């Protein structure tokens, strides 16, 4: 019999953390974060990282594990999450995975085809080609090989263009083809919940309010500190995080303060829309919860889990 795991998914600003804290007070669970932004140290305000008080009530694994200069893949997450889940299960508890990075959940459930290690010779050739023709030309080349990846990658994002082309030159397969090849399935029985306000206008209002709250809490100073380091740039996954990118571009002088706020809110709403699109197309059953009914949401999870465990 496989051990049980609980997934608590949902768009940004939907109330996942609050519900996770409530669940931990009533269930033998330990929380694992499923969030590609919370992994970074020194990025607290703009990621809406749980506060010290919240973490005291419900410690989260897989937050604050990397410096913003480092990259982290869905494969990295799967390895780390499986290790943490095994540790939690060994303690006789249930892993409660909480977050909105849907690609991480997909990787965890379905497994991933391992991607090849970097080839410095190929990378050097691509760098040389880019120096002569520009990264936009290499992006055009990528679009012919792998239009799906090219559509997701900004033409100026040299790091991701290089990697996508490198993978193709090493394997003869596109990055999209390789990531669609399934690996080892998840060795857990998992119950899935998704929390969101039933009224999308409420979610949009929450996102706007949260962004303004981040500004009040010192988000600009947080990004200024990262900017002043000198070793970070806008092509890094950390700085591409929603909100950070817009504040970074403002600090670079790309646009005015009010424009930065507008763009930050719009980008966060677009993120929420993408997360909801993922969830609506999810292949395995999800129990939906209403953010506006937190007590009912908690009771639904407890009731559903009780009946699930009884079989």
Curated annotation (Swiss-Prot):
It comes from Haemophilus influenzae (strain ATCC 51907 / DSM 11121 / KW20 / Rd). It catalyses: adenosine(37) in tRNA + dimethylallyl diphosphate = N(6)-dimethylallyladenosine(37) in tRNA + diphosphate. GO terms for molecular function: ATP binding; tRNA dimethylallyltransferase activity. Residues 35-38, 159-163, 240-245 are annotated as: Interaction with substrate tRNA. This is tRNA dimethylallyltransferase. The gene is miaA. The record marks 101, 123 as: Interaction with substrate tRNA. Monomer. Its EC number is 2.5.1.75. One of its GO terms (biological process) is tRNA modification.
């Amino acid at each position: 019999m496989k051990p049980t795991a609980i997934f608590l998914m949902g768009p940004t600003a939907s109330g996942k953390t609050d519900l996770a804290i409530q669940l931990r007070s009533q269930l033998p669970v330990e929380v694992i974060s499923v969030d590609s932004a919370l992994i970074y140290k020194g990025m607290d305000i703009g990621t809406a990282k749980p506060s010290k008080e919240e973490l005291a009530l419900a410690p989260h694994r897989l937050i604050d594990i990397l410096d913003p200069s480092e990259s982290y893949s869905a494969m990295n997450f799967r390895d780390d999450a499986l290790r943490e889940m095994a540790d939690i299960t060994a303690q006789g508890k249930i892993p409660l995975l909480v977050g909105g990075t849907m690609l991480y959940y997909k990787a965890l459930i379905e497994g991933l085809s391992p991607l090849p290690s970097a080839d410095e010779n190929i990378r050097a050739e691509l760098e040389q080609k880019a120096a002569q023709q520009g990264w936009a030309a290499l992006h055009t080349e990528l679009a012919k090989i792998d239009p799906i990846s090219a559509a997701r990658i900004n033409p100026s994002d040299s790091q991701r263009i290089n990697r996508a082309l490198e993978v193709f030159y090493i394997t003869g397969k596109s990055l999209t083809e390789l990531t669609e090849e399934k690996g080892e399935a998840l060795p857990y029985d998992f119950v899935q919940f998704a929390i969101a306000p039933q009224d999308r206008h409420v979610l949009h209002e929450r996102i706007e309010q949260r962004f303004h709250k981040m500004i009040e809490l010192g988000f600009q100073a947080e990004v200024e500190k990262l900017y002043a380091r000198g070793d970070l740039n806008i092509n890094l996954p950390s700085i591409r995080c929603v909100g950070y990118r817009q504040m970074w571009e403002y600090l670079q002088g790309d646009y005015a303060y009010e424009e930065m706020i507008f763009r930050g809110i719009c980008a966060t709403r677009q993120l929420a829309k993408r997360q909801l699109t993922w969830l609506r197309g999810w292949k395995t059953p999800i129990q939906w919860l209403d953010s506006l009914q937190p007590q009912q949401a908690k009771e639904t999870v407890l009731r559903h889990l009780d009946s699930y465990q009884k079989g």
